[in-house]
Amino acid sequence: MTDIKSMNLTEMAAYFKELGEPAFRAKQVFQWLHRGVFSFDEMTNLSKPLREKLAASCILYAPQVERRQVSALDGTIKYLWRLRDGNCIETVLMRYHHGNTVCISSQVGCRMGCAFCASTLGGKVRDLTPAEMLDQVLFTQMDSGAPVSNIVLMGIGEPLDNFDTVLRFLELVNSPDGLNIGMRHISLSTCGLTEKIDKLADYQLQLTLSVSLHAPDDETRSRIMPVNRSVGVEKLFAACRRYFEKTGRRISYEYAMIDGVNDADWQADLLARHLKGTPGHVNLIPLNNVEESPLKPSRRVAAFQKRLESHGITATVRRKLGGDIDASCGQLRRKTMQQEHT
């Protein structure tokens, strides 16, 4: 079966040529798919024989809403989707004054092993396809009735560990014949795969790269983020500098504030030294509690921010959304998995 929704327009045109159909059919089907149509029968400008041919040869699967949580505080919606193979992923819709942002997953599970993240518990199961990533945006938009203006790849999984798929997804959502979401409205988060950061820089995409840093020194970062053991903080910051030089895009550094682990003044001072001379922004994140983790939220967020700012570093505190639901990454999926195995 052909995964037609993962195709770009050029590939789709070639596919229709193989079927003996005119190339313009590809654009018609592409536009239907990117409007959120999940049945060839709904594509009313196609002939019935062609619709039947496509239905017999192509995968077109709508993800099922396993659970939906809506925050009474701010309207944030957390979705748990059931995929066609039975696996589950999460998507979060966040409402801001500037528009609606959807946070999507790039993998089923994650193999990065970060100590403070629920999505890595149980490891990585598999990569998502471009279609499965796109469906999160389309279905969230359809279900909520909220048009999506911004996308963040900060859900379950390490996007750069699924590099080619993520690039294709970015191409699809950026297409003028699809959702046409501009690259400057897309953020991609990585825990710091330096070779992939360099590879991404070569494409010179105008998206925002968000580096999940969480500690400025190797001892601390290696303890809470195993990926650092093979990379190191110096190599990571060097890759970030190269990325900025190639793309001209300022990097956002994500920093989850953990009590007694990464919130000391000396760590703020060290972080500031790393960032001197390279435009960047530090996003301080109040830690979400994970039941299986002993790590606790820091009470020094404001002090840490002030310390960074005293060095001339731009630092903000992430607004916490969905505080009354399982809105942080991997929590809802983890709870569902535990329930299914009891």
Task: Say what each PLM segment does.
Residues 85-99:
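P-loop NTP-binding catalytic core
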Residues 121-150:
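Conserved alpha-helical substructure of the radical SAM core
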Residues 35-36, 119-124, 217-218, 287-291:
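A short, flexible beta-alpha/helix-coil linker loop
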Residues 95-132:
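Canonical Radical SAM [4Fe-4S] cluster-binding loop centered on the CxxxCxxC motif
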Residues 141-150, 155-311, 315:
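Conserved AdoMet/S-adenosylmethionine-binding subsite of the radical SAM
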